[in-house]
Amino acid sequence: MWSLLLLAALVGQGFALKNVFDMRIQLPHSVNFGETSVSGYTEFPPLSLQEAEQLVPESSCNMDNHQSLSTINKLTKVIWRKKANQESANQNSFEVVESEVSFKGLCMLKHRMVEESYRNRRSVICYDLACNSTFCKPTVYMIVPIHACNMMKSCLIGLGPYRIQVVYERTYCTTGILTEGKCFVPDKAVVSALKRGMYAIASIETICFFIHQKGNTYKIVTAITSAMGSKCNNTDTKVQGYYICIIGGNSAPVYAPAGEDFRAMEVFSGIITSPHGEDHDLPGEEIATYQISGQIEAKIPHTVSSKNLKLTAFAGIPSYSSTSILAASEDGRFIFSPGLFPNLNQSVCDNNALPLIWRGLIDLTGYYEAVHPCNVFCVLSGPGASCEAFSEGGIFNITSPMCLVSKQNRFRAAEQQISFVCQRVDMDIIVYCNGQKKTILTKTLVIGQCIYTITSLFSLLPGVAHSIAIELCVPGFHGWATAALLITFCFGWVLIPACTLAILLVLKFFANILHTSNQENRFKAILRKIKEEFEKTKGSMVCEICKYECETLKELKAHNLSCVQGECPYCFTHCEPTETAIQAHYKVCQATHRFREDLKKTVTPQNIGPGCYRTLNLFRYKSRCYILTMWTLLLIIESILWAASAAEIPLVPLWTDNAHGVGSVPMHTDLELDFSLPSSSKYTYKRHLTNPVNDQQSVSLHIEIESQGIGAAVHHLGHWYDARLNLKTSFHCYGACTKYQYPWHTAKCHFEKDYEYENSWACNPPDCPGVGTGCTACGLYLDQLKPVGTAFKIISVRYSRKVCVQFGEEHLCKTIDMNDCFVTRHAKICIIGTVSKFSQGDTLLFLGPMEGGGIIFKHWCTSTCHFGDPGDVMGPKDKPFICPEFPGQFRKKCNFATTPVCEYDGNIISGYKKVLATIDSFQSFNTSNIHFTDERIEWRDPDGMLRDHINIVISKDIDFENLAENPCKVGLQAANIEGAWGSGVGFTLTCKVSLTECPTFLTSIKACDMAICYGAESVTLSRGQNTVKITGKGGHSGSSFKCCHGKECSSTGLQASAPHLDKVNGISELENEKVYDDGAPECGITCWFKKSGEWVMGIINGNWVVLIVLCVLLLFSLILLSILCPVRKHKKS
């Protein structure tokens, strides 16, 4: 029994989980003016017709539901059934039954209900039903004031057995509607629709509810008659009211019809032309079968005497709403017609109805919200980095190849904030945000962590510890050189003798080994000579008894005496006088080396004479003179090494730290430069061209080449749509195929294949006795249309760069294209060729804001498009909707006593879904600084994927006598500095530069300290005051950065901040991509000493307490030296 209860509980939980659905309501992250409401809907699986009539919506949200929806609403229920007498079955063998039914919470909104709910902070929750004769599919709609997003994140709605989790999702739009990944703001002015070239057009989903209200201003049938051009009588006595609509799930109420609002005009047109709207098919119901019984008329309400509504009876999956309102009565006769399609065709005046709820796409004019750039910050967090991205107008797309970017976003005020974690900081962090490539230099994060660690260890003196830490934590050799320099200065008087002693011990150890080895080799040589001499004069030195080879004569005599007597000649132990016994004894005897040692004592001196070992023993490593000499020498060497290593290694070889000045080129021959330049890079070349005959005559040359601009003349193809393909079989037993109008006939894209008068007993359902009388209609149509992107076809593409040349006082500029040249009297600059991935005829597809880049299609259909091709469903801007062709073949599948079913062997997957499945096979491109119209797109490539082949030739024929004098005078002043020295991010120096004596002057301004320049900016100066910002990387704590032009610098400099733990800002790649070459000399020995002196002066002028602490440590080391190594006292003789 308990097992059964447990099983029931588990099954009940599983059933409950299946009945929980999501309703996601998208809303902008700012509340705009007006009575803006947001809406959403959710469709559910079918219920029985009896259960559907008992539904009541419930809500657990903290906003009250509007009370009027809890009232009971009465409708006329119309159902159809077969006639009782089936003896002579024909096309009229069925009948309708009218009755009154009551619903609670049905979407029968009252006048001013939505407006009142906005003012009272209440929600409107209702439902609609799509039914056949046996079951219904409910759809729940919810309208809430936009303030709900500030009051709740989610809530729960109940409808019968179903539960709806309402989730409010903030988009990155400020106030607009999210469509195609862009934020669209509709414009209601009619003039914007007339001047479409000035505005964008977007397809927006709209939900409309009919409001019944009597009054002269609400004669909706009169408006329909006027729009359709039909001549209907007695329109004053027909239904009165209006539609209230929410556009894109986020808008103020739109009232239709309204002649002064273009949005209302488009909505009203959509309701008239496609009154059924979008179908209610659930996933898996794309392929379905209808059996049409025929047309019939009914009485609305059931108490009237004459029939006033035409309907079409069917059996099959319900796809469209079963609620409507009778058009012929001004009293508001609401209809519930399960299993019947009401006649919604407004081209006829009688026996028709209006939809109670309408949902569909409409084309609206308006504009897209601007895309704002991103700010990305990172801080070190554990083994990785914690980063945040901000954007004023929201973030539409953020990705990173090395970070974990969550899609759960949160907002802060008017900006959108996204936090994410990067697991590795051993390489720079790259983030793509709102179409911009940001690089966070993690070197600075590591510097900050190092500073924090050292400061924490010496927390008693935090100021001093921080000043020392910022010197020690510079990455690379420079940091180690700094550590060595500080240690030598503070503890050198103790470490020098200690290290010297350790070195002497090691050297003496090796000297002793070498001395012993030399003695042993010398002794072996003596033995060898003695043995050879003995063998020459007296014979063998082998004992005759034991056969042992002796080394000396004394040893041989001992063998001759002892071996005969059976004794060991070495230890005098008794043993048998046989060779085997004595040889075995020798192996264990401990005195076999006795005669060898005696001889060694005789021939080897016992004391070690003067040599390396004795010299090492006599070395006076404790001498104060030696320690002072080494201390001073080490400080000088380490200072030079420290200064030489103070330059930062750049990310890419775009800037190389060098000394002041500009390089010179003697013009013996023409000066030619030939190189390849990435599309994202700028190029600056500056030299002094000198007269080969007279070095005193020179002309300044400055060439600046801007980054590549890409301009494409395009044809705006329109919006590309994703869609769902439906295959519906409609069978009716009697009549021609043209007898009935099916709901899919009002879809934008549909195709029908008819099999007329082909039914027989082998292809009929049991209730159809006719033979050769009916029709099987196979309908293909597209629904759930959703715009996904914008397509442009390239007519021509142009790659260009702006080139400026300053030759002496001559200043010229020109924008040149591929295979074009800029020719002056002395210079010729050409773009010989461009390596590109764009070509004429390509199609550019933007799946979102154009700032985010796009995809290149080499094959995009424009004329004959099949469903499933790229570009299959298109909505051109100023042309009718373009539908694809369906090239597959239809087949009618028949079985005995079974309703025929249509089969289609063509493709059923949309082109957009196919592209998404294989998107990695297409070429993509990123864009920056994009500007676009319907006819032209201009942008820059931030990734440097394209390259230009550039050739520069400077003629040697220069009139140096007339061009050597340059009248332009430049004045410099350092105004402000931001950033940090020595860090990966660098600093930005703001310079005030004045120009006199000439109107314009192209030159470069550098950011330098006393010795080295760390960055430059090529700029065209105008007469008067100019502001120039220079970005540089490197320097040290003593660097005073000045604005320099050539060898002249501003009188005062500014010091940058130290690297610290503040957030590291991302660098835009376009701002950082520049190649600068002015031929300035590299830093030499004099430059190194300048850097060292500037550093020392910086410490003295800055935190002088550091110097005092270092001197105290030096004094401590001297005292420690006197204790450990006291001065030797010499006694007077």
Swiss-Prot record:
GO molecular function (one): zinc ion binding
The annotated region (Fusion loop) lies at 755-775
PROSITE patterns in alphabetical order: ITAM_2
Give me the Cytoplasmic side stretches, as residue ranges: 505-626, 1126-1133
User: Where does the signal sequence lie?
Assistant: 1-16
Domain ITAM: start-end pairs? 609-632
Q: Where is this region: Binding to the ribonucleoprotein?
A: 514-531, 586-603, 590-601, 609-623, 1120-1133
Transmembrane portions of the chain: 485-504, 627-647, 1106-1125
Q: Motif YxxL at which residues?
A: 613-616
A GO CC term attached to the entry: virion membrane
Gene Ontology terms: biological process: fusion of virus membrane with host endosome membrane; signal transduction; symbiont entry into host cell; symbiont-mediated suppression of host innate immune response; symbiont-mediated suppression of host TRAF-mediated signal transduction; virion attachment to host cell
Ranges in the topological domain labelled Lumenal: 17-484, 648-1105
Site features described as Cleavage, chain residue numbers? A646, A647
Q: Does the keyword Zinc apply?
A: yes
Disulfide pattern: C61-C155, C107-C126, C131-C136, C173-C183, C208-C245, C232-C349, C374-C433, C378-C387, C403-C422, C450-C473, C733-C768, C737-C775, C749-C883, C763-C894, C778-C902, C804-C813, C821-C830, C861-C865, C968-C998, C991-C1043, C1008-C1013, C1044-C1049, C1083-C1087
**What's the protein called, per UniProt?**
Envelopment polyprotein
Organism equals Seoul virus (strain SR-11) (Sapporo rat virus)
